[in-house]
Amino acid sequence: MIHVLDLKFQNKPDTIAAFLIETSAGPILVETGPYSTFKPLKEAVQGKGYTLEDIKHVFITHIHLDHAGAAWALAELGATIYLHPFGKQHMNAPSKLLASATRIYGEEGMERLWSTLKPIPAEQLKTVEHQEVITVGDTTLKAWHTPGHAVHHIAWQWGEELFAGDVAGVKIEGGPAMPPCPPPDINIEHWQESLRLIRSLKLNHIYLTHFGAIPAAQIHRHLDELEAGLLRWANWMRPHYEQGKKAAEITPLFQAFVKQQLAAAEVTEAQYDLYENANPAWMSVAGLLRYWRKKLEQ
């Protein structure tokens, strides 16, 4: 059984999820959220009849702080953390990850949004290859390496359920599928390949960290909408890059573009605030500019 745990990020609902799976060997967790939501995580796990100490296996889709920022705290309680090989060094020695995040969010934003990040001992970090299967009790999870949003991204398949992290986008309270495009790894072509892989799987649901379950009947429409949105964002950004505009100049224009897109989808102001909480438009400016710089100057 899968339990969707709302981590109440920034005291708002439906923004960041973790997922608790019950197995014969005890509960396992997919995603941890940031350490700033560790208390809501603890309370949500307790609400399902477990303690955090019961969780010995944690699967993260990628090492961005909204997905894996509390992994160290679960490791301190004895959990093994399963992740992409490219992520191990950054979770074991997070100085570069912290420096990169601080450049994006600033010192104040780091503390307010993500809180503390500590190293995880190498022996508690289990790297998982593409299509490798991990067995926990009577449960198996299969790793699909799914780059595009991040080079260290894994979508975890449990039976006909897929925990898709950010590669399957953001969808809040029935709104449109939106692509999170933070720096430094955005690669449109790789992302499209990952979406083709997901489309090829036989699934009952896709579980989005931002936020919740997409049922089988809606999966292909959701992924098509996400891909179209990803291309729309990238194509909007290209002329601004080619004109040599700076991120500070582009950001308010892009924010207005995204808000207009959400308004056209009849997203309410309350929903818009949740989208911005999960996937702030300003964050994608640097990611898309970097994508075009790498693509056009290589």
Model-derived features: positions:
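Divalent-metal (often Zn2+) His-rich catalytic cores of metallo-beta-lactamase-fold enzymes
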Residues: 77, 192-247
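C-terminal regulatory/interaction regions
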Residues: 236-298
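Active-site metal-binding motif and surrounding structural segment of the metallo-beta-lactamase
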Residues: 39-86
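Short, glycine/acidic-enriched loop or turn micro-motifs at the edges of active sites
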Residues: 9, 25, 34, 65, ...
